[in-house]
Structure formats: C-alpha cells, structure tokens
C-alpha cells in the first residue's frame, strides 16, 4: 500500500509539475513549444527517414504504425525525440490517416527531458484498435503512459495509465479496454468477451457470463460516475505460487479522493525456466 501511495503521489506530482489538466481527445493546445516547432519542421520535410514499425491486418482492420526521428535532442542524453504516426482503416475506409503523436500531444507540458516511447499494438476488437504509448526520461521509469483507443466510428480517446510497477499493472490494461467497450453504443458483446479472454482465466470468463459485465465495478462507479473514472492498481505482499491478491482502485479524474476498490485475484503459472508469472485475472470481487 505504501508503494502505491508513493507511486500515485509521484504521478500526481509529475502532472502537477507539468501543469494543465490531462487532455482527453485529439484537441491540441495553441501554445507553441520548441519541440513542437522542430516537430513541425520535420513534418514539413515529409517525415524524412520514416520507418514502419507495425503493419498489421485483423479481420477488416488494417493498422500501420510508423516512427520518425525529430531534430529535438533529449536533454542529458545523446538521443533524439520521435514522432509516431498511426494510420487505420476498416472495410477499406480510412479512419485515421497518419494521425500524429508527439510527447506534447500526449501531455502538453512535457519538456525535452522526456522522449516519446515506442508504440505497441495491444488489442484489436470489432469496435476499437488499442495502442499503448508513453513519454519517459530515457533509461528510467519516470514519465507518463497512455492507452490510445481508435474506434470504428472515427473517434479517438486517450486514457492515462498510472503504473504501479508491479504484477498488477496489466489489470489496468484490462480495465481500460473493458470499460471502453462497455461505453460503446451499442455494446459489442463479442468485443467484451475478447478482452476478457485476453486477460482472464476460464474461471473469470465464467464469472463475467454469470454476473454480467458491470459486476466488476463498484456500484457507485456505475451509477454515479457512468464508468468515467481513473483506474489504478496495487499488489499485496500476500501471495504464493498459485494466487496473487491485488486491488483495483477507482478515482475521479484528476483527484486523489478514492471512490472505491475491487479485489482482484491473479492466477500464477510457472515460467518456462523458473519463477512464477501472474498474468491472468481469475476473479474480481468486492
């Protein structure tokens, strides 16, 4: 618990130091920073040395993720910042065409101590493409991490993903995507099941089918906040080779006032060589 408090305090402090609120969506600020100007110059050069890092098709989706190095040098390191470009089409229709992401489009006040991370394709459902992206001080865990959701209706949403730096982090991945699917209109049941199967055991799948997709949220998160909350996680020190108890915590956006929690049991499995991996949710309860 003390570790979580320290991590949450660090995240809130970082957000406070970086100023301005977390921006959800694609709207960009009007203030021009030095790295924005450099990034603009790179853009005007037609993305010199553009590198395709992901070119993937799934069902009727086609996703291309590209990177290009900018002229912005990271302070204190012999490294340069980058731009990530995301292009997504569905059924042959282009939904996002070289959608540009920089560290300042993730969070407007990130300075040149931070470097945009690599982008990772997390999940593709019937409704949404999920990509993770962050900005960190090189060779450290200090920075901000986000889940980007590109929906089939052409809308984009950005979710802050606070990192606990322990076995519980993937729980937040699951909750962000599962919650996003629950907020679709109409909700696509197959997409919910896909996310659950990617992160849960057969026992957890059975629980969701029996108790319903909203059963893994505190009642007030559903009724009062309509699932529009900040989600975080923490591990406990009480675990064995079979199970690892964790908690998921729900907060209002940009607030440290806890709404409620849920208990999460992770199921362990032995690694190929040694150790135990806790990478599946087995049950979520009050």
Label every PLM stretch briefly.
Residues 27-29:
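Bacterial signal peptide processing site
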Residues 59-66, 71-74, 127-136:
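Short beta-strand elements that form the blades of beta-propeller/WD-repeat-like
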Residues 154-160, 255-286:
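Short beta-strand edge/turn micro-motifs at domain boundaries
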Residues 93-112:
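Surface-exposed loop and turn segments in beta-propeller and other repeat-based domains
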Residues 120-121, 210-256:
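Surface-exposed, charged secondary-structure patches
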Residues 2-14:
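Bacterial N-terminal signal peptides that target proteins for export
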Residues 22-25:
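C-terminal motif of bacterial Sec signal peptides marking the signal peptidase cleavage site
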Residues 164-215:
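Core segments of small alpha/beta cavity-forming domains
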């Amino acid at each position: 618990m003390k570790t979580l408090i320290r991590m949450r305090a660090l995240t809130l402090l970082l957000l406070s130091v970086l100023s301005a609120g977390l921006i959800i969506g694609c709207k960009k600020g009007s203030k021009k920073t030095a790295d924005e100007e450099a990034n603009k110059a790179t853009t005007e050069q037609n993305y010199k040395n553009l590198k395709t890092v992901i070119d993937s098709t799934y069902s009727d989706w086609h996703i291309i993720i590209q990177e290009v190095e900018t002229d912005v040098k990271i302070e204190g390191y012999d490294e340069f910042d980058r731009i990530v470009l995301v292009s997504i089409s569905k059924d042959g229709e282009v939904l996002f065409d070289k959608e540009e992401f920089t560290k300042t489009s993730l969070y407007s006040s990130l300075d040149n101590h931070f470097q945009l991370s690599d982008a990772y394709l997390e999940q593709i459902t019937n409704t949404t493409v999920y990509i993770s992206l962050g900005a960190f001080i090189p060779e450290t865990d200090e920075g901000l991490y986000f889940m980007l959701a590109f929906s089939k209706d052409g809308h984009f949403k950005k979710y802050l993903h606070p990192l606990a730096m322990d076995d519980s982090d993937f729980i937040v991945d699951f909750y962000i995507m599962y919650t996003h699917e629950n907020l679709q209109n109409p909700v696509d049941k197959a997409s919910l099941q896909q996310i659950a199967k990617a992160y849960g055991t057969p026992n957890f799948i059975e629980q969701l089918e029996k108790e319903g997709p909203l059963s893994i949220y505190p009642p007030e998160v559903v009724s009062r906040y309509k699932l529009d909350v900040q989600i975080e996680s923490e591990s406990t020190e009480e675990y064995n080779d079979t199970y690892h108890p964790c908690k998921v915590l729900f907060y209002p956006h940009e607030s440290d006032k806890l709404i409620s929690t849920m208990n999460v049991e992770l199921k362990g499995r032995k690694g190929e060589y040694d150790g135990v991996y806790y990478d599946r949710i087995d049950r979520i309860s009050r």
